[in-house]
C-alpha cells in the first residue's frame, strides 16, 4: 500500500474537531512564548475560538454517517458526535468563567488553558474511542490533566489535598479498569478493537463466562469512578470543595459525559449476553447515588461541597436512561446531559462570581444576596430550581423524560427512588434560595453587608456574566423547546447503528 493510500485509509478528517483543539493549544503556547504576559488578554479568547471551530466541525460531521478512523481505533457516529459537542460546549463556557478567577488568583493563564484544552481533548477522544487501548489512553489524558488542574492553586492547602486524593483514587480506579481490559484482551485472543472482542467472545462462547463477569465488574468500577457514582464517589466532595471552581465545573459535566458515553459503548457492545448482570449492578449504583447524594447534600454548609453531592445524585439520574436500554432511554440520557450542562455550569458560574466578591463559599454567607445583587440571586435561583426539577425550567422536563423512559422500560423501583430523592433535593436547593431573598437585617450575612452594590449592564458585562446569562437562557429555553430537543436526541440514537443493533 502506498503512503497516500495509507493516509487516506486512516480517515484523518474524522478527528478534525480534536485536531483543531490540538492546534489551538500549540498556538496558545507559541503566542505566550513570544509575547509572554502581554498576550494574557487574548489567550482565553483564542481557546474559545478553537472550541467554537471544533464545535462547528462537529456539526458538519453530524450527518447520520458512521466513519471509522485510524484502523478501527476511533469511530464517529451521531451519538459520539453529540457527546463530543456537549464536552466542547461545556469547555467553552468553563473558559469564560475561569478568566476573572485566574486573574484574581494571579496564576499563569497560558499553562492553565493548555492543560484545560488537553483535558477536553482526552474527554472528546474517549467518546469516539473504539478499542481498549485508545479508551485507556484517552481516559488517562483526561485523568492526568484533571489531577494537575485540581491542584493548580499550589499555595492552597485544600487544592493540594484534593489533588492528592484525586490522584491516588484515580490511579487505583485506572489500574482496576486496565485489569478488566486485560482480561478481555486475553479472552479475545489478543484483539483490542471492541467489536472484534465481542465477536470473539461470542465465537468462543465466553460471553457469559466467569472471566467475562470479573472483567465486567472491574470495568464498571473504573467507569463509576469517572462519573462519580456511589459508592465510588469518595473523591468528588473533597475535589469539588478544594479544587479551583472552574475546574470543578468542567469535571462535573465533561467527566460525566465522557464516562456515560464510554459506559454506553462498552456495555451494549461487549456485554449483551450478561445484560441482566450489568443492569442489576448499575441499578444498585443508581439507587445508591440518588439516595446518598441527595441525603448527604442536605447537611452541607459549603456550597461547592453541596453541589458535589448533588452531582453524585445527578449521576444516578443519568443511569436511569442507560438502564432503560431503548431509544427513549438513550435519548433521555442525552437530553438530560444537555440540560444538566446549562443548569450546573450556571450554578457554578454564580458561585464563582459570588466568591470573587466575598471570598466565601459558605452557604450562610448567601443570606440577603437579593438586596445587593438581585440579578445574580435570580440567576442562581433559576439554576438551583432547575437542578431540583421544578417547572417550567429544563431540569423538570429532562427528569420527566428520564423517569418516563425508565417507567416504560419497567424500571419501577429506579423511577420511584428517583422521584423520592428529587423531592428531597428540592429542600436543600430551596433553602439557599430562601436565604438569598431574606430582607430582615439580623439574618443578612456579614459578607453581604460588605458586598458592593452590583448593577449589571451590557456595556460593562464581564466574561463570567456572559457565561451565567448563556447558562440561564439555556436552562430556560430548554424547558420551552424540549420537544424539538427530544426529537433531535431520538434521531441521534436511531442514526447510531451499533446502538440499534443491540
From Swiss-Prot:
Keyword Zinc part of the UniProt annotation: no
Major place of residence: plastid
Alphabetized Pfam families for the sequence: Ndh2_N, Proton_antipo_M
InterPro entries: NADH-Q_OxRdtase_suN/2, ND/Mrp_TM, Ndh2_N
GO molecular function list: NADH dehydrogenase (ubiquinone) activity; quinone binding
Family: Belongs to the complex I subunit 2 family.
Cross-referenced HAMAP family: NDH1_NuoN_1 (MF_00445)
Stated name of the protein: NAD(P)H-quinone oxidoreductase subunit 2, chloroplastic
Protein's gene: ndhB
